[in-house]
Amino acid sequence: MPSVLWVLFDGGADRPVGRKTPFYVAFKPTIDYLSSLGSCGMLDPISPGIRPGSDTAHLALFGYDPYKYYTGRGAFEALGADVALKPGDVAFRTNLATVDEAGVVIDRRAGRYIAPEEARSVEEVINKIGEEIGKKYGVDVFYKSTVEHRGVLVIRGPVSHRVSDTDPHRVGAKILRSEPLERSKEAALTAEVVNEITLRFMEISKELEINKARRLQGKLPINAILLRGGGYMPQIEPIREKYNIRAAAIAGVALIRGVARAVGMDVYTAPGLGGTKDDVFDQAVKLAVELMSKYDVVFLHVKGTDSTSHDGDFNGKVSVIERLDKALAPYLDKLLNNYFVVTSDHATPVSVKEHTGEPVPILLYGPDVVQDDVSKFSELTCWRGALGRIRGIDVMPILGSYLGLTEKFGE
């Protein structure tokens, strides 16, 4: 029985720069060859004009209405970081950042490329702060670094996810004060804990040895922690029950691992797949192809296209696409006998450096999929494809139909 290999370029879609996009420019003979044999189209991750987060977009792409199932990013980050959440826990996505003396954000990612040993050092400091503050407020606080500047912070106790972010989401703005979004003791307490952690880390970070070393190296100091997306674990029907599909995900980023795990996918990682722009894809693709004999759908997440987009790095984005395509090439014969999907979860134009709301290109190849006249996978060409314009939430039912796994609606 055939299966599906689904490659997703996070933030891969773009706007033209000089009338060309990274997908258009990239030398990707394997993906383009399969495009010439399959059906292409455009996909609205959620709906036209909506700027998706990676969390809500992946929920939709996995076949779950984000307006029904989304309860905040933090819980998915925690799940993907192997943090066991209990009922009532509130989890936040965090960024290690750089601010000036007035608390104005200079860089929301502290230069982005934070070494693992630096991240571990900061993790120890924040957990020590959390222990002290937790005792004061009668809660437990736990922080875990994930990849580069990213991390997750969990508060356990009489708390609420109904508090505002401290992350202003832009450079040049001051760190925000968390405020309760409902009139409850739990929300008020949670906001107090968040604000105290924020202030304490800013104070202590001035004397951290890693920051002294970073300054000597000409790097930005890690002197702030930004919190956003406070949430709790939603109750989600497993994908095997909802779509009769056995699914696996390969990802190096905690958020995507968490969303996949939340919907009941088996989650894997691979050597070289760390969720950065420098990822090496050979082992990840090899694993994906091997897993196709065990699962109906194997999902492979590529983070580097989003990271380079946020950095405004056009050529870097092209390089990520080309490296993934090169890793696919040895398995072309295998792909020709199965189904193959390529798309993005959202556009992150290098000219904007943020998520935007336009549709993204999608390719569906299979031995029995209609062949249209699109021969190159890009935002500029897939409009002509036979798939037309679909939504993210349509993808899983379409795959289930081709695999013969979905039930008929009606008689």
Curated annotation (Swiss-Prot):
One of its GO terms (biological process) is glycolytic process. Its EC number is 5.4.2.12. InterPro entries: Alkaline_phosphatase_core_sf, ApgAM_prokaryotes, Metalloenzyme, Pglycerate_mutase_ApgM, Pglycerate_mutase_ApgM_sf. It is an enzyme of class 5 (isomerase). Pathway: Carbohydrate degradation; glycolysis; pyruvate from D-glyceraldehyde 3-phosphate: step 3/5. Catalyzes the interconversion of 2-phosphoglycerate and 3-phosphoglycerate. This is 2,3-bisphosphoglycerate-independent phosphoglycerate mutase. The lineage of its organism: Archaea, Thermoproteota, Thermoprotei, Thermoproteales, Thermoproteaceae.
